[in-house]
Curated annotation (Swiss-Prot):
DNA-binding span(s): 267-329
Positions of the UniProt region annotated as Disordered: 33-64, 206-272
Protein name: Homeobox protein meis3-B
Gene this chain is encoded by: meis3-b
Keyword flag DNA-binding: yes
Transcription regulation in keyword set: yes
GO terms, biological process: angiogenesis; animal organ morphogenesis; anterior/posterior pattern specification; brain development; central nervous system development; embryonic pattern specification; eye development; hemopoiesis
CC annotations in GO: cytoplasm; nucleus
Length: 451
């Protein structure tokens, strides 16, 4: 700093006053020339060298003389210094090396120290002002403007630093996974293993419950019926749910905080992993209405109230259940049938059931090829494929104690419990006040676990 001022050669001197008193000391002086404020809209800040030159004088000579006056003014080194600081303040990145007194070279504090150093350098020199008061005014006001500009730049830097600090703090608070990797590597691994083990144990318990339930159903029926296929599909659904739980645990490692566990639970709920109680209620309704597994709007509202789910979630669950549970049961009945036509997605006879697109599912007669008598199937008169109203199948001996009407197995051809009519049965034994179609449509449920 001292060397820079020593290199300047045109110092006329300084009497020890500070820069703040420069303007006050100069205002008492009488102006010897007319003011330039009348010729420029910017007042006295206009440059003295921009005064129009008389026609008789050369413009180049006058311009050179004015430049020499500005460059030789005692305050010009200070003006150049503050201008350089403003340039440094707009540079990126800022220089925080602290090479100048005051640390940061572009700070306002460093400029105050530069003024003190400048006053010491020119204290023994000539007076601070020149013989041109307009030029003195120009230099003082230019230094003041640059000083204000430097202060504004310092405020901008402070705001930027504050914003960066708050932004980084916010990122660290919103993204704790990076901190987990650095600081909680061991604890996160142990928490992840515990959470994965709990999901595996839940899956084992669920599979054990399914096997026990399957053995109980086989004991009651004596033969593996469609219920085994339904339970197998349930096992697949539960396993897939447990798999989603394990995948979710791997995707989001635990941080050991309650907030993360709550976030995982909410994510599981959004992914469609419903509580076991809710799925059991909906499965029970599905097996009770296998002849038409399409709940009405009122039934959906009731199921949603019983399960604590929304109507949309109940609707989506039944759409998936008809594809994963009911359809495998239909396929199994087709494989075990004796003469039933294969399943066709176009709606042909398939032995027991048919899925008419995604609209409804009814029971269509497979033809009743093995039934003697005067009955002839007339599918054109029954849109849902039920036998005519005058036809009633023979009731098996053990079905008298059933609470839900005839078993579904009696309508499956080739099933061990399918109905067998005597060859000499009289027509009046086949007449009933209510047909199976009326019984089903009037709300009687079918229980496939009754055997």
């Amino acid at each position: 700093m001292a060397q820079r001022y020593d290199e300047m050669v045109h110092y006329p001197g300084l009497d020890g006053m500070s820069l703040a008193g420069f303007a006050d000391a100069h205002t008492g002086r009488a102006l010897q020339h007319h003011s330039l404020s009348q010729s420029t809209p910017y007042g006295s800040t206009g440059a003295a060298h921009r005064v129009p030159m008389p026609p008789g004088m050369g413009s180049n000579d006058g311009l050179k003389r004015e430049k020499d006056e500005i460059y030789g003014h005692p305050l010009f080194p200070l003006l150049a210094l503050v201008f350089e600081k403003c340039e440094l303040a707009t540079c990126s990145p800022r220089d925080n090396s602290g090479s100048f007194p005051g640390g940061d070279v572009c700070s306002s504090d460093s400029f105050n120290e530069d003024i003190a150093v400048f006053a010491k350098q020119v204290r023994t020199e000539k007076p601070l002002f020149s013989s041109n008061p307009e030029l003195d005014n120009l230099m003082i006001q230019a230094i003041q403007v640059l000083r204000f500009h430097l202060l504004e730049l310092e405020k901008v830097h402070d705001l930027c630093d504050n914003f960066c600090h708050r932004y980084i703090t916010c990122l660290k608070g919103k993204m704790p996974i990076d901190l987990v990797i650095d600081d909680r590597d061991g604890s996160s691994k142990s928490d992840l293993e515990d959470f994965t083990g709990s999901c595996t144990s839940l899956s084992d318990q669920n599979n054990t419950w399914i096997r026990d339930h399957d053995e109980t159903g086989s004991t009651h029926s004596g033969t593996p019926g469609p219920s085994s296929g339904g339970l197998a599909s349930q096992s697949g659904d539960n396993s897939s749910e447990q798999g989603d739980c394990m995948d979710n645990s791997v995707a989001s490692p635990s941080t050991g905080d309650d907030d993360d566990l709550d976030r995982d639970k909410k994510r599981n709920k959004k992914r469609g992993i419903f509580p076991k109680v809710a799925t059991n209620i909906m499965r029970a309704w599905l097996f009770q209405h296998l002849s038409h597994p399409y709940p009405s709007e009122e039934q959906k509202k009731q199921l949603a109230q019983d399960t604590g789910l929304t109507i949309l979630q109940v609707n989506n669950w039944f759409i998936n259940a008809r594809r994963r549970i009911v359809q495998p049961m239909i396929d199994q009945s087709n494989r075990t049938g004796q003469g039933g036509a294969p399943y066709s997605p176009d709606g042909q006879n398939m032995g027991g059931y048919v899925m008419d697109g995604q609209q409804h599912m009814g029971i269509r007669p497979p033809g009743f090829q093995g039934i003697p008598g005067d009955y002839t199937a007339a599918p054109s008169t029954m849109p849902m494929g039920f036998p005519p109203a005058g036809y009633t199948p023979a009731i098996p001996p053990h079905s008298a104690g059933l609470r839900h009407g005839p078993s579904l197995h009696s309508y499956l051809p080739g099933h061990p419990h399918s109905m067998i009519l005597p060859a000499g049965a009289s027509p009046h034994h086949l007449v009933s006040a209510q047909s199976p179609a009326d019984a089903l449509l009037n709300g009687q449920n079918i229980d496939i676990h009754a055997h």
